[in-house]
Amino acid sequence: MSETSGEKLNIEYKQEYVSDIKKEVIAFANAEGGTVFVGICNDGAVKGVDDPDEVMLRIVNSLKDAIAPDVMPFVRVDSVAIEGRNVIEIQITTGTNRPYYLREKGLKPGGVYVRKGSSSQPMTEEGIREMLLQNSGRSFELCRSMTQELT
């Protein structure tokens, strides 16, 4: 696997486990999905992790505790060998209960993230409203107007 050529729209590298991984997972679940690699530097250099089981446990517990609604059905966390080193691969698919957000921040900018280019950005209030409408199966265009004339 030689995906280590730098971050892309659907790939994020983290040299080590840091708590902002939650933001990356939220951003991918709210967008088109993606993969976060822990143990790879931003430039693609493979560093690896010392204790993959402990890192995976920390990641899973962090995601379960910090993200609402539950994102875990759309996340897979594995230990993989890249260039002979243990790296954690977090695969995220697009969630069905979007928008996902940080519990402590709530359903507002600063709590909701989306992937834009090769970075995760806070969503605007307008973007959050749009996503809520899309996810509820309703869009503005499909809402019935009380003054609409039927032909």
Q: Locations of the language-model features?
A:
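Conserved N-terminal catalytic/coupling substructures associated with nucleotide/phosphate chemistry
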Residues: 1-151
